[in-house]
Swiss-Prot record:
The keyword Lipoprotein does not apply. This is Solute carrier RCH1. Solute carrier protein that negatively regulates the cytosolic calcium homeostasis in response to high levels of extracellular calcium. Residues 1-15, 72-87, 140-149, 221-234, 286-327, 384-434 are cytoplasmic. InterPro entries: Na+/solute_symporter_sf, Put_Na-Bile_cotransptr. Gene3D superfamilies: 1.20.1530.20. Belongs to the bile acid:sodium symporter (BASS) (TC 2.A.28) family. It is a multi-pass membrane protein. It comes from Saccharomyces cerevisiae (strain ATCC 204508 / S288c). The gene is RCH1. One of its GO terms (cellular component) is plasma membrane. The modification Phosphoserine is found at S425. One of its GO terms (molecular function) is monocarboxylic acid transmembrane transporter activity. The chain crosses the membrane at residues 16-36, 51-71, 88-108, 119-139, 150-170, 200-220, 235-255, 265-285, 328-348, 363-383.
Length: 434
Protein backbone atom coordinates (compact mmCIF):
# COMPACT_ATOMS: atom_id res chain seq x y z
CA UNK A 1 0.00 0.00 0.00
CA UNK A 2 2.83 2.37 0.90
CA UNK A 3 4.59 1.47 -2.35
CA UNK A 4 1.49 2.34 -4.39
CA UNK A 5 1.06 5.60 -2.48
CA UNK A 6 4.68 6.60 -3.08
CA UNK A 7 4.35 5.71 -6.77
CA UNK A 8 1.27 7.92 -7.09
CA UNK A 9 3.08 10.79 -5.36
CA UNK A 10 6.05 10.33 -7.68
CA UNK A 11 3.84 10.42 -10.77
CA UNK A 12 1.95 13.45 -9.42
CA UNK A 13 5.22 15.33 -8.88
CA UNK A 14 6.69 14.36 -12.28
CA UNK A 15 7.64 17.19 -14.65
CA UNK A 16 5.18 16.02 -17.32
CA UNK A 17 2.35 15.95 -14.76
CA UNK A 18 3.32 19.41 -13.52
CA UNK A 19 3.15 20.73 -17.08
CA UNK A 20 -0.28 19.16 -17.63
CA UNK A 21 -1.52 20.64 -14.36
CA UNK A 22 -0.32 24.08 -15.41
CA UNK A 23 -2.30 23.73 -18.66
CA UNK A 24 -5.51 22.54 -16.99
CA UNK A 25 -7.54 25.41 -18.42
CA UNK A 26 -6.80 24.54 -22.06
CA UNK A 27 -7.26 20.81 -21.45
CA UNK A 28 -10.70 21.43 -19.94
CA UNK A 29 -11.54 23.84 -22.76
CA UNK A 30 -10.65 21.21 -25.38
CA UNK A 31 -12.85 18.63 -23.61
CA UNK A 32 -15.78 21.06 -23.45
CA UNK A 33 -15.40 21.95 -27.15
CA UNK A 34 -15.60 18.24 -28.04
CA UNK A 35 -18.73 17.89 -25.89
CA UNK A 36 -20.22 20.99 -27.54
CA UNK A 37 -19.53 19.46 -30.95
CA UNK A 38 -21.40 16.22 -30.28
CA UNK A 39 -24.02 17.51 -27.82
CA UNK A 40 -24.66 21.14 -28.76
CA UNK A 41 -28.25 21.13 -27.54
CA UNK A 42 -27.18 20.83 -23.90
CA UNK A 43 -25.67 24.29 -23.23
CA UNK A 44 -26.74 26.32 -26.28
CA UNK A 45 -29.02 29.33 -26.16
CA UNK A 46 -32.52 27.87 -25.75
CA UNK A 47 -31.12 24.39 -25.15
CA UNK A 48 -31.63 21.82 -22.42
CA UNK A 49 -30.30 23.97 -19.58
CA UNK A 50 -31.28 27.29 -21.22
CA UNK A 51 -27.68 28.45 -21.59
CA UNK A 52 -28.67 32.05 -22.23
CA UNK A 53 -29.93 32.22 -18.63
CA UNK A 54 -28.10 29.55 -16.60
CA UNK A 55 -24.70 30.40 -18.10
CA UNK A 56 -25.18 33.76 -19.80
CA UNK A 57 -26.57 35.26 -16.60
CA UNK A 58 -25.62 32.83 -13.81
CA UNK A 59 -21.92 32.31 -14.55
CA UNK A 60 -21.25 35.95 -15.40
CA UNK A 61 -23.11 37.05 -12.26
CA UNK A 62 -21.00 34.75 -10.10
CA UNK A 63 -17.81 36.26 -11.53
CA UNK A 64 -18.91 39.78 -10.63
CA UNK A 65 -20.28 38.73 -7.25
CA UNK A 66 -16.78 37.44 -6.55
CA UNK A 67 -15.34 40.74 -7.74
CA UNK A 68 -17.72 42.68 -5.51
CA UNK A 69 -16.71 40.66 -2.47
CA UNK A 70 -13.01 41.34 -2.98
CA UNK A 71 -13.03 45.04 -3.90
CA UNK A 72 -13.05 48.00 -1.54
CA UNK A 73 -15.98 50.34 -2.20
CA UNK A 74 -13.89 53.51 -2.05
CA UNK A 75 -11.37 52.16 -4.58
CA UNK A 76 -14.17 50.98 -6.87
CA UNK A 77 -15.77 54.43 -6.94
CA UNK A 78 -12.40 56.08 -7.53
CA UNK A 79 -11.81 53.86 -10.56
CA UNK A 80 -15.29 54.58 -11.86
CA UNK A 81 -14.31 58.28 -12.03
CA UNK A 82 -11.08 57.61 -13.94
CA UNK A 83 -12.37 59.23 -17.13
CA UNK A 84 -8.98 59.23 -18.87
CA UNK A 85 -8.63 55.44 -18.72
CA UNK A 86 -12.26 54.94 -19.76
CA UNK A 87 -11.82 57.27 -22.73
CA UNK A 88 -8.64 55.47 -23.83
CA UNK A 89 -10.23 52.02 -23.64
CA UNK A 90 -13.46 53.07 -25.34
CA UNK A 91 -11.60 54.71 -28.24
CA UNK A 92 -9.45 51.59 -28.62
CA UNK A 93 -12.32 49.12 -28.26
CA UNK A 94 -14.84 50.77 -30.57
CA UNK A 95 -13.10 53.15 -32.98
CA UNK A 96 -9.50 52.08 -33.55
CA UNK A 97 -9.96 48.29 -33.62
CA UNK A 98 -13.07 48.41 -35.81
CA UNK A 99 -11.49 50.85 -38.28
CA UNK A 100 -8.36 48.71 -38.67
CA UNK A 101 -10.35 45.49 -39.16
CA UNK A 102 -12.58 47.27 -41.68
CA UNK A 103 -9.47 48.28 -43.64
CA UNK A 104 -8.19 44.69 -43.67
CA UNK A 105 -11.61 43.41 -44.78
CA UNK A 106 -11.66 45.92 -47.64
CA UNK A 107 -8.25 44.63 -48.75
CA UNK A 108 -9.41 40.99 -48.60
CA UNK A 109 -12.59 41.88 -50.47
CA UNK A 110 -10.57 43.66 -53.16
CA UNK A 111 -8.45 40.51 -53.61
CA UNK A 112 -11.68 38.75 -54.69
CA UNK A 113 -10.66 35.32 -53.40
CA UNK A 114 -13.66 32.97 -53.84
CA UNK A 115 -12.49 30.80 -50.92
CA UNK A 116 -13.09 33.65 -48.45
CA UNK A 117 -16.83 33.94 -47.90
CA UNK A 118 -18.27 37.44 -48.20
CA UNK A 119 -20.47 37.00 -45.13
CA UNK A 120 -17.48 35.93 -43.05
CA UNK A 121 -15.95 39.33 -43.79
CA UNK A 122 -19.16 40.93 -42.52
CA UNK A 123 -18.79 38.76 -39.42
CA UNK A 124 -15.26 40.08 -38.90
CA UNK A 125 -16.54 43.66 -39.06
CA UNK A 126 -19.32 42.82 -36.60
CA UNK A 127 -16.80 41.22 -34.23
CA UNK A 128 -14.59 44.31 -34.33
CA UNK A 129 -17.51 46.60 -33.46
CA UNK A 130 -18.53 44.59 -30.38
CA UNK A 131 -17.74 45.91 -26.87
CA UNK A 132 -15.10 44.41 -24.60
CA UNK A 133 -15.73 40.97 -23.17
CA UNK A 134 -17.70 40.63 -19.94
CA UNK A 135 -15.72 38.02 -18.00
CA UNK A 136 -12.34 36.99 -19.39
CA UNK A 137 -10.55 40.35 -19.22
CA UNK A 138 -11.52 40.76 -15.53
CA UNK A 139 -10.08 37.32 -14.76
CA UNK A 140 -6.91 37.86 -16.80
CA UNK A 141 -6.31 41.34 -15.36
CA UNK A 142 -6.69 39.98 -11.83
CA UNK A 143 -4.36 37.05 -12.48
CA UNK A 144 -1.71 39.32 -14.02
CA UNK A 145 -1.74 41.73 -11.07
CA UNK A 146 -3.36 44.58 -13.00
CA UNK A 147 -6.02 47.04 -11.90
CA UNK A 148 -9.04 44.74 -11.72
CA UNK A 149 -11.18 47.53 -10.23
CA UNK A 150 -10.73 49.62 -13.36
CA UNK A 151 -11.45 46.54 -15.47
CA UNK A 152 -14.77 45.89 -13.74
CA UNK A 153 -15.80 49.52 -14.25
CA UNK A 154 -14.84 49.35 -17.91
CA UNK A 155 -16.86 46.17 -18.46
CA UNK A 156 -19.95 47.90 -17.12
CA UNK A 157 -19.43 51.15 -19.07
CA UNK A 158 -18.26 49.51 -22.30
CA UNK A 159 -21.10 47.00 -22.57
CA UNK A 160 -23.68 49.60 -21.62
CA UNK A 161 -22.48 51.94 -24.38
CA UNK A 162 -21.98 49.03 -26.78
CA UNK A 163 -25.72 48.59 -27.14
CA UNK A 164 -25.82 52.03 -28.81
CA UNK A 165 -22.38 52.26 -30.44
CA UNK A 166 -22.18 48.80 -32.07
CA UNK A 167 -25.32 49.12 -34.26
CA UNK A 168 -24.25 52.64 -35.27
CA UNK A 169 -20.77 51.42 -36.30
CA UNK A 170 -22.28 48.52 -38.26
CA UNK A 171 -24.49 50.96 -40.16
CA UNK A 172 -21.50 53.22 -40.85
CA UNK A 173 -19.35 50.39 -42.25
CA UNK A 174 -22.09 48.70 -44.32
CA UNK A 175 -24.10 51.59 -45.73
CA UNK A 176 -22.05 51.67 -48.94
CA UNK A 177 -19.84 49.47 -51.12
CA UNK A 178 -18.04 47.13 -50.81
CA UNK A 179 -20.14 45.79 -47.90
CA UNK A 180 -23.58 47.22 -48.68
CA UNK A 181 -24.92 43.68 -49.13
CA UNK A 182 -24.33 43.07 -45.40
CA UNK A 183 -26.32 46.04 -44.13
CA UNK A 184 -28.83 44.77 -41.54
CA UNK A 185 -32.49 45.72 -41.60
CA UNK A 186 -32.32 49.39 -40.67
CA UNK A 187 -34.00 50.08 -37.36
CA UNK A 188 -35.60 46.62 -37.03
CA UNK A 189 -35.27 45.23 -33.54
CA UNK A 190 -32.89 47.91 -32.28
CA UNK A 191 -35.19 48.94 -29.43
CA UNK A 192 -35.55 45.33 -28.29
CA UNK A 193 -31.79 44.95 -28.60
CA UNK A 194 -31.20 47.87 -26.25
CA UNK A 195 -33.62 46.38 -23.74
CA UNK A 196 -31.91 42.97 -23.78
CA UNK A 197 -28.45 44.45 -23.37
CA UNK A 198 -29.54 46.70 -20.51
CA UNK A 199 -31.17 43.74 -18.78
CA UNK A 200 -28.15 41.47 -19.24
CA UNK A 201 -25.59 44.05 -18.09
CA UNK A 202 -27.78 45.07 -15.17
CA UNK A 203 -28.61 41.57 -13.90
CA UNK A 204 -25.26 39.90 -14.61
CA UNK A 205 -22.83 42.76 -13.84
CA UNK A 206 -24.33 45.59 -11.80
CA UNK A 207 -26.63 43.68 -9.41
CA UNK A 208 -24.11 40.98 -8.34
CA UNK A 209 -21.38 43.62 -8.02
CA UNK A 210 -23.67 45.69 -5.78
CA UNK A 211 -24.66 42.63 -3.72
CA UNK A 212 -21.00 41.71 -3.28
CA UNK A 213 -20.22 45.22 -2.04
CA UNK A 214 -23.12 45.09 0.46
CA UNK A 215 -22.04 41.68 1.79
CA UNK A 216 -18.42 42.82 2.06
CA UNK A 217 -19.30 45.90 4.11
CA UNK A 218 -21.98 44.23 6.28
CA UNK A 219 -20.13 40.95 6.95
CA UNK A 220 -16.39 41.71 6.67
CA UNK A 221 -15.25 38.71 8.76
CA UNK A 222 -17.34 36.21 6.85
CA UNK A 223 -16.20 37.68 3.53
CA UNK A 224 -12.54 37.50 4.59
CA UNK A 225 -12.99 33.86 5.66
CA UNK A 226 -14.65 32.96 2.34
CA UNK A 227 -11.96 34.63 0.24
CA UNK A 228 -9.23 33.09 2.38
CA UNK A 229 -10.78 29.64 1.92
CA UNK A 230 -10.77 30.04 -1.88
CA UNK A 231 -7.17 31.23 -1.85
CA UNK A 232 -5.99 28.46 0.49
CA UNK A 233 -7.39 25.65 -1.66
CA UNK A 234 -6.69 27.36 -5.02
CA UNK A 235 -10.35 27.42 -6.03
CA UNK A 236 -10.50 29.56 -9.18
CA UNK A 237 -14.19 30.29 -9.55
CA UNK A 238 -13.63 32.90 -12.28
CA UNK A 239 -11.78 30.43 -14.50
CA UNK A 240 -14.44 27.74 -13.99
CA UNK A 241 -17.20 30.16 -14.95
CA UNK A 242 -15.23 31.34 -17.99
CA UNK A 243 -14.97 27.74 -19.22
CA UNK A 244 -18.74 27.35 -18.97
CA UNK A 245 -19.31 30.63 -20.84
CA UNK A 246 -17.09 29.45 -23.70
CA UNK A 247 -18.79 26.04 -23.61
CA UNK A 248 -22.15 27.73 -24.14
CA UNK A 249 -20.80 29.89 -26.99
CA UNK A 250 -19.39 26.88 -28.84
CA UNK A 251 -22.58 24.89 -28.26
CA UNK A 252 -24.62 27.69 -29.84
CA UNK A 253 -22.21 27.96 -32.77
CA UNK A 254 -22.19 24.19 -33.44
CA UNK A 255 -25.97 24.01 -33.17
CA UNK A 256 -26.33 26.75 -35.80
CA UNK A 257 -23.82 24.94 -38.09
CA UNK A 258 -21.46 27.90 -37.89
CA UNK A 259 -18.33 25.89 -38.64
CA UNK A 260 -19.78 23.73 -41.41
CA UNK A 261 -21.31 26.64 -43.32
CA UNK A 262 -17.91 27.93 -44.53
CA UNK A 263 -14.89 26.27 -46.15
CA UNK A 264 -11.87 24.89 -44.29
CA UNK A 265 -9.67 27.48 -45.99
CA UNK A 266 -11.86 30.23 -44.58
CA UNK A 267 -11.65 28.75 -41.07
CA UNK A 268 -7.84 28.56 -41.29
CA UNK A 269 -7.71 32.15 -42.53
CA UNK A 270 -9.85 33.28 -39.59
CA UNK A 271 -7.69 31.45 -37.04
CA UNK A 272 -4.46 33.09 -38.20
CA UNK A 273 -6.07 36.48 -38.79
CA UNK A 274 -7.67 36.56 -35.34
CA UNK A 275 -4.43 35.55 -33.63
CA UNK A 276 -2.37 38.14 -35.49
CA UNK A 277 -4.86 40.97 -35.05
CA UNK A 278 -5.24 40.29 -31.31
CA UNK A 279 -1.48 40.43 -30.74
CA UNK A 280 -1.28 43.58 -32.88
CA UNK A 281 -4.10 45.24 -30.91
CA UNK A 282 -2.40 44.32 -27.63
CA UNK A 283 0.79 46.05 -28.76
CA UNK A 284 -1.21 49.04 -29.97
CA UNK A 285 -2.97 49.22 -26.60
CA UNK A 286 0.41 49.30 -24.86
CA UNK A 287 1.51 52.24 -27.02
CA UNK A 288 -1.72 54.08 -26.18
CA UNK A 289 -1.41 53.29 -22.46
CA UNK A 290 2.24 54.36 -22.10
CA UNK A 291 3.10 56.76 -24.96
CA UNK A 292 6.81 57.54 -24.82
CA UNK A 293 6.47 61.10 -26.09
CA UNK A 294 4.57 62.17 -22.94
CA UNK A 295 7.68 61.50 -20.87
CA UNK A 296 9.71 63.53 -23.34
CA UNK A 297 7.30 66.47 -23.24
CA UNK A 298 6.83 66.38 -19.44
CA UNK A 299 10.05 65.04 -17.88
CA UNK A 300 9.36 66.50 -14.40
CA UNK A 301 6.65 67.98 -12.23
CA UNK A 302 5.95 71.72 -12.49
CA UNK A 303 8.31 73.74 -10.30
CA UNK A 304 6.73 76.61 -8.41
CA UNK A 305 8.05 79.92 -9.69
CA UNK A 306 10.05 78.36 -12.54
CA UNK A 307 7.62 76.42 -14.73
CA UNK A 308 5.35 78.38 -17.05
CA UNK A 309 1.59 78.37 -16.65
CA UNK A 310 1.25 76.54 -19.99
CA UNK A 311 3.59 73.78 -18.81
CA UNK A 312 1.73 73.45 -15.50
CA UNK A 313 -1.71 73.20 -17.11
CA UNK A 314 -0.47 70.89 -19.88
CA UNK A 315 1.23 68.65 -17.32
CA UNK A 316 -1.95 68.29 -15.25
CA UNK A 317 -4.04 67.49 -18.35
CA UNK A 318 -1.78 65.21 -20.41
CA UNK A 319 0.74 63.64 -18.00
CA UNK A 320 -1.84 61.30 -16.37
CA UNK A 321 -2.38 59.72 -19.82
CA UNK A 322 0.91 57.89 -19.17
CA UNK A 323 -0.65 55.16 -17.04
CA UNK A 324 0.82 53.02 -14.31
CA UNK A 325 1.65 49.42 -15.17
CA UNK A 326 -1.44 48.14 -13.35
CA UNK A 327 -3.70 50.39 -15.39
CA UNK A 328 -1.76 49.61 -18.58
CA UNK A 329 -2.38 45.87 -18.09
CA UNK A 330 -6.10 46.56 -17.77
CA UNK A 331 -6.02 48.61 -20.99
CA UNK A 332 -4.09 45.88 -22.84
CA UNK A 333 -6.68 43.27 -21.86
CA UNK A 334 -9.80 45.42 -22.38
CA UNK A 335 -8.80 47.17 -25.61
CA UNK A 336 -8.48 44.15 -27.97
CA UNK A 337 -11.07 41.91 -26.28
CA UNK A 338 -14.52 41.35 -27.81
CA UNK A 339 -17.53 39.90 -26.04
CA UNK A 340 -19.27 36.77 -27.23
CA UNK A 341 -21.91 36.77 -24.50
CA UNK A 342 -23.41 40.06 -25.71
CA UNK A 343 -21.94 39.83 -29.21
CA UNK A 344 -24.19 36.94 -30.20
CA UNK A 345 -27.25 38.95 -29.10
CA UNK A 346 -26.01 42.04 -30.94
CA UNK A 347 -25.54 40.06 -34.17
CA UNK A 348 -28.73 38.00 -34.05
CA UNK A 349 -30.81 41.07 -33.19
CA UNK A 350 -29.55 43.03 -36.19
CA UNK A 351 -29.71 40.13 -38.68
CA UNK A 352 -32.95 38.55 -37.52
CA UNK A 353 -34.33 38.40 -41.08
CA UNK A 354 -31.17 36.79 -42.55
CA UNK A 355 -31.09 33.48 -40.69
CA UNK A 356 -29.43 31.70 -43.61
CA UNK A 357 -26.24 33.72 -43.05
CA UNK A 358 -26.30 33.76 -39.25
CA UNK A 359 -23.89 30.84 -38.87
CA UNK A 360 -21.29 32.52 -41.08
CA UNK A 361 -21.66 35.78 -39.17
CA UNK A 362 -21.00 34.05 -35.84
CA UNK A 363 -17.88 32.10 -36.90
CA UNK A 364 -15.39 35.00 -36.54
CA UNK A 365 -16.80 36.01 -33.14
CA UNK A 366 -16.68 32.51 -31.63
CA UNK A 367 -13.17 31.82 -32.95
CA UNK A 368 -11.95 35.23 -31.79
CA UNK A 369 -13.26 34.54 -28.30
CA UNK A 370 -11.35 31.30 -27.81
CA UNK A 371 -8.16 32.69 -29.37
CA UNK A 372 -8.24 35.84 -27.27
CA UNK A 373 -8.60 33.79 -24.08
CA UNK A 374 -5.72 31.48 -25.03
CA UNK A 375 -3.45 34.35 -26.05
CA UNK A 376 -4.38 36.47 -23.03
CA UNK A 377 -3.64 33.53 -20.75
CA UNK A 378 -0.14 33.44 -22.26
CA UNK A 379 0.26 37.19 -21.69
CA UNK A 380 -0.71 36.83 -18.01
CA UNK A 381 2.65 35.36 -17.02
CA UNK A 382 4.54 37.97 -19.06
CA UNK A 383 2.65 40.89 -17.52
CA UNK A 384 3.01 39.42 -14.03
CA UNK A 385 6.80 39.25 -14.41
CA UNK A 386 6.73 42.80 -15.81
CA UNK A 387 5.12 44.09 -12.59
CA UNK A 388 7.15 41.90 -10.23
CA UNK A 389 10.39 43.12 -11.77
CA UNK A 390 9.61 46.69 -10.74
CA UNK A 391 8.33 45.60 -7.33
CA UNK A 392 11.69 43.95 -6.64
CA UNK A 393 13.54 47.00 -7.94
CA UNK A 394 11.49 49.30 -5.71
CA UNK A 395 12.21 47.07 -2.72
CA UNK A 396 15.96 47.16 -3.30
CA UNK A 397 15.90 50.95 -3.74
CA UNK A 398 13.94 51.34 -0.51
CA UNK A 399 16.41 49.22 1.47
CA UNK A 400 19.34 51.20 0.08
CA UNK A 401 17.64 54.44 1.11
CA UNK A 402 17.20 53.19 4.67
CA UNK A 403 20.88 52.32 4.97
CA UNK A 404 22.03 55.72 3.76
CA UNK A 405 21.31 58.43 6.34
CA UNK A 406 21.91 61.33 3.98
CA UNK A 407 19.57 60.49 1.16
CA UNK A 408 18.35 63.14 -1.23
CA UNK A 409 14.84 64.24 -0.25
CA UNK A 410 13.70 64.13 -3.85
CA UNK A 411 14.75 60.49 -4.12
CA UNK A 412 12.84 59.58 -0.95
CA UNK A 413 9.69 61.20 -2.31
CA UNK A 414 9.98 59.32 -5.59
CA UNK A 415 10.41 55.97 -3.82
CA UNK A 416 7.60 56.68 -1.38
CA UNK A 417 5.18 57.56 -4.13
CA UNK A 418 5.90 54.30 -5.92
CA UNK A 419 5.36 53.10 -9.46
CA UNK A 420 2.47 50.93 -8.50
CA UNK A 421 0.23 53.84 -7.43
CA UNK A 422 -2.72 54.36 -9.73
CA UNK A 423 -3.03 57.50 -11.76
CA UNK A 424 -6.51 58.07 -10.42
CA UNK A 425 -5.44 60.69 -7.90
CA UNK A 426 -3.23 62.36 -10.53
CA UNK A 427 -0.32 62.36 -8.05
CA UNK A 428 2.32 61.43 -10.59
CA UNK A 429 5.79 60.52 -9.27
CA UNK A 430 8.61 62.87 -10.05
CA UNK A 431 10.64 60.03 -11.51
CA UNK A 432 9.58 58.63 -14.85
CA UNK A 433 7.37 55.52 -14.61
CA UNK A 434 9.21 52.41 -15.61
Amino acid sequence: MKTQYSLIRKIWAHSVTEFLKSQWFFICLAILIVIARFAPNFARDGGLIKGQYSIGYGCVAWIFLQSGLGMKSRSLMANMLNWRAHATILVLSFLITSSIVYGFCCAVKAANDPKIDDWVLIGLILTATCPTTVASNVIMTTNAGGNSLLCVCEVFIGNLLGAFITPALVQMFTNRAPFAYGNPATGNGIGALYGRVMKQVGLSVFVPLFVGQVIQNCFPKGTAYYLGFLKKYHIKIGSYMLLLIMFSSFSTAFYQDAFTSVSHVCIIFLCFFNLGIYIFFTGLSYLCARPWFILKLFPHEPIEGKSTRLYRYSYNIFRPFYYSKEDAICIMFCGPAKTAALGVSLITSQYGDKKEHLGKLLVPLVLYQVEQVMTANFFVSLFKRWIQKDAQADGSESSCANENEEVDLEKIISIGTGENQSVLSNNVPYTQPR
